[in-house]
Amino acid sequence: MAKKSVIQRNINRLKLINKYSAQREAIKNEIKRTSKVEKKISLYSNISRLPRDSSKVRLRSRCWVTGRGRSVYKNFGLSRHMFRFMASNGLLPGVVKSSW
């Protein structure tokens, strides 16, 4: 189980991403449309003034059961440990252990 503070930090990042996503996208679209270098530099400085945690890159995908941040399957939202446990106990519909 991940520490509660780490899970909460990720939740706070998600809130910041939702709050600043429209503003960040507007600036990025304006950068794409602009051809003047001076204007692009000023727009990049506008992006850098936004909170760092409002960037989507800083969000960590975590297991929804344990909060583990590594080896998380995106399709299920589970870490490899919980995926194996739940699949072997038949808790994931449609998942069958392969054998050949």
From Swiss-Prot:
GO terms for molecular function: rRNA binding; structural constituent of ribosome. GO terms for cellular component: chloroplast; small ribosomal subunit. InterPro entries: Ribosomal_uS14, Ribosomal_uS14_bac/plastid, Ribosomal_uS14_CS. Keywords: Chloroplast, Plastid, Ribonucleoprotein, Ribosomal protein, RNA-binding, rRNA-binding. Pfam families: Ribosomal_S14. Gene3D superfamilies: 1.10.287.1480. The keyword Oxidoreductase does not apply. GO terms for biological process: translation. Its main location: plastid. It is found in: Plastid, Chloroplast. Part of the 30S ribosomal subunit. Binds 16S rRNA, required for the assembly of 30S particles. Belongs to the universal ribosomal protein uS14 family. NCBIfam families: PRK08881.1. This is Small ribosomal subunit protein uS14c. It comes from Cyanidium caldarium (Red alga). The gene is rps14.
